[in-house]
Design a protein with these regions (language model features):
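Iron-sulfur cluster-binding electron-transfer modules in prokaryotic oxidoreductases
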Residues: 43-341
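Secondary-structure capping and boundary motifs in well-ordered enzyme cores
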Residues: 14-28, 132-135, 155, 159
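Ferredoxin-type iron-sulfur electron-transfer modules and their immediate structural context
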Residues: 1-26, 35-37, 42-45, 51-58, ...
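Short, well-ordered helical secondary-structure segments
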Residues: 13-19, 27, 126, 172, ...
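Cys/His-rich metal-chelating microdomains
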Residues: 29-35, 39, 188, 304
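Short metal-coordination and nucleic-acid-contact micro-motifs, chiefly zinc-binding Cys/His arrays
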Residues: 19-22, 28-32, 181, 297
Length: 343
């Protein structure tokens, strides 16, 4: 229709409908390819379409380039914003804060706040573990370098501290990559269609991990499965692991597991499914609980990076079948290996 020039009014109507239904509310994670008999990844198409929205030289592209070149500063700026939001939550209360931010989202398209929004967090030099024979390079994701626990979180330590504690108990010395604050796997830019910027960040990260791992001598652990999925696609010469896989493969025999009888739910992320690691997460969960519940018909959670903030209706729809199952099964706590999913 675009080539022929026929019915331009219908073309504009269809294009506008697709902008929302096919682009803005596409998670872009490619999980659709696993259920498609032809293995078609519509997420790749979405990235290409988004790429055309941000051509080099456009305002959006220049903003993305600036963020990539000043990433440490961007994260430093985000931390006080999170602290301010947490202070407002404490002052106003959950109900009032939710009402105000929903109105702001509806009126101006500002990111939607939720009660599970985490506080700010920063890794300290004192967090590093002492010298040991076994070594692992730990690259905490951008999210976990910046975001800690929510105000009413049921746990008392951020993920990074928990991971460091486990590694130390198992006899592993942790090596952080040099200049970690400015590093990123590139998923942020890939999801926006800025593929060349994403690749440049991947190249930068690979060089830092190659140095930290002493040219691949030590394994590399990244604590977010979507980040690891991209890293495995772009970094070939280093052994890369996500937390459940690393714990189950290397730490299982070095730690003592005492399973609880409390039932727990497990959410398997899109990237874990695509990497074939779902059974490892389930097996690890079964070492920790005698009752592991896997919700049915809950695939992608719909958060998709920032979609849970900018298009919260996607998140709501994706998880519409979750709460009834948890209530029926009497599940009071759930686990996953992606911080944004916890939100």
């Amino acid at each position: 229709m675009k080539k022929s020039g026929e019915n331009p009014q219908l073309l504009e109507t269809l294009s506008e409908l697709y902008r929302y239904s096919g682009n803005r509310t596409c998670a872009g994670d490619g999980l659709c390819a696993m259920s498609c008999p032809m293995g078609i990844n519509t997420g790749d198409l979405t990235h290409i379409l988004r790429q055309s929205e941000f051509p080099p030289g456009s305002t959006g592209y220049r903003a993305g380039k600036f963020a990539a070149n000043h990433f440490a500063g961007i994260k430093s700026t985000l931390r006080p914003v999170l602290s301010l939001a947490n202070a407002a939550h404490s002052l106003l209360g959950t109900s009032t804060m939710t009402s105000i931010t929903r109105k702001m989202h509806s009126a101006w398209g500002l990111p939607q706040w939720t009660p599970a929004m985490p506080k700010s967090y920063k890794i300290r030099k004192s967090d590093q573990t002492p010298a040991m024979n076994n070594k692992v390079v730990y690259f905490p994701s951008c999210i976990n370098q910046t975001m800690g626990l929510a105000k009413d979180s049921p746990v008392n330590q951020p993920l990074v501290k928990q991971m460091l504690s486990l590694l130390q108990k198992a006899g592993y010395e942790v090596i952080f990559p040099p200049k970690m604050e400015k590093l990123c796997c590139g998923t942020i830019w890939e999801s926006k269609g800025m593929l060349d910027i994403a690749d440049s960040k991947s190249t930068e990260l690979e060089a830092a991990l190659w140095e930290a791992s002493e040219q691949g001598r030590y394994p590399v652990l990244c604590d977010q499965s979507p980040c690891l999925h991209r890293m495995r696609a772009t970094i070939q010469k280093i052994k890369l692991y996500e937390p459940a896989e690393f714990i189950y493969t290397f730490l299982r025999d070095k730690l003592e597991f005492t399973p609880t009888d409390r039932p727990i739910a497990i959410h398997i992320t899109c990237s874990m499914r695509k990497m074939g690691l779902a059974n490892i997460l389930i097996s690890l969960a079964k070492l920790c609980s005698t009752q592991v519940f896997i919700p049915e018909e809950v695939g992608c959670c719909g958060f998709a990076g920032d979609k849970g903030f900018t298009q919260p209706e996607l998140n709501t729809y994706a998880l519409r079948k979750l709460r009834p199952q948890l209530t029926k099964a009497g599940i009071g706590i759930g686990y996953s290996n992606l911080s944004l999913i916890h939100i």
